[in-house]
């Protein structure tokens, strides 16, 4: 056979020896596959590398990338957006935030927005409130109507749970819900300051837009939901997972709530 193929005897046995060797990356491949599965295929190689490090598995990023490619493991990608702008209904606030998305402490700047889902011929709306310090979703509400109760309830819940101090900035777009007196009254009740993106400028609330992009690509697009309840449960579960498990490069590989708790623990020991 070797004579027919023209393959050198030494080359044949060298390849044969390699095939017979145990795969030195077998355990690592298994870990990577588990992380991909646990993250619902939302982690790219960088987050998987971080997760491995958090589990005390030290490996080069390039190795993780190569092994994922060899196993056909790819992360989901993203797609577009609900617009709640209805013109100037009441009050338009200044853009106090001014794209200062990096904050040095919790409860200094909160951002919010509304996004839309479709299931079984019905529209479902999500209103989350996020802390820019650690990107934690502090509270969220779901409804089949994008009314002022939807947005006010999520902000009221966040205030009740996290007790922000005076001077809190609450930033949104110019959606009609945020021009309403109920929203402005809630902000004033804690001595807060209202901030709004400039008209039609999604980059002024880019962090929340980014969260919506991740949420939809990671748990909604490509999935099959048969009812409003099923979709709402999946969104609730995703937000819990995002807060407690979704690793963030900017936070040295910690999930939002991990980073928040670590920061608060340091503050208490000072």
Region locations from a protein language model:
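An active-site-proximal beta-strand-loop segment
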Residues: 99, 103-138, 144-146
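C-terminal domain-tail junction helix/linker
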Residues: 188, 214-270
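Active-site beta-loop-alpha junctions of metal-dependent nucleic acid enzymes
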Residues: 122, 141-163, 169
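Basic, flexible linker segments flanking DNA-binding modules
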Residues: 9-105, 201, 257-264
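Generic alpha-helical secondary structure signal
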Residues: 4-11, 27, 182, 189, ...
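K/E-rich alpha-helical interaction surfaces of small helical-bundle regulatory domains
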Residues: 1-19, 58, 234-254
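Mobile genetic element proteins and their domesticated derivatives, centered on retroelements
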Residues: 1-5, 12, 32, 48, ...
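RNase H-like two-metal-ion nuclease catalytic core shared by retroviral integrases
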Residues: 86-88, 172-174, 180-181, 196-216, ...
């Amino acid at each position: 056979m070797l004579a027919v193929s023209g393959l050198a005897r030494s080359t044949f046995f060298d390849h044969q020896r390699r095939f017979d060797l145990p795969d030195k990356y077998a355990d690592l491949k298994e870990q990577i596959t588990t992380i991909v599965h646990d993250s619902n295929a939302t982690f790219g190689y960088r987050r998987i590398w971080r997760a491995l490090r958090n589990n005390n598995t030290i490996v080069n990023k390039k190795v993780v990338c190569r092994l994922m490619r060899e196993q056909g493991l790819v992360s989901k990608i993203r797609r577009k957006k609900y617009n709640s702008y209805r013109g100037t209904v009441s009050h338009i606030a200044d853009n106090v935030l001014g794209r200062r998305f990096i904050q040095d402490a919790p409860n200094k700047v909160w951002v919010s927005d509304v996004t839309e889902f479709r299931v079984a011929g019905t529209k479902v709306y999500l209103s989350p409130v996020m802390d820019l310090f650690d990107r934690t979703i502090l509270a969220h509400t779901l409804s089949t109507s994008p009314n002022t109760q939807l947005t006010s309830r999520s902000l009221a819940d966040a205030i009740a749970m996290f007790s922000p101090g005076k001077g809190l900035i609450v930033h949104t777009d110019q959606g009609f819900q945020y021009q309403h007196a109920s929203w402005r009254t809630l902000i004033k009740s804690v001595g807060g300051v209202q901030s709004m993106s400039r008209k039609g400028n999604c980059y002024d609330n880019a962090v929340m837009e980014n969260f919506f992009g991740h949420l939809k690509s990671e748990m909604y697009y490509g999935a099959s939901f048969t009812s409003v309840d099923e979709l709402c449960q999946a969104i609730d579960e995703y937000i819990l997972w995002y807060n407690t498990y979704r690793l963030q490069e900017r936070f040295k590989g910690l999930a939002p709530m991990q980073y928040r708790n670590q920061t608060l623990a340091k503050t208490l020991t000072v």
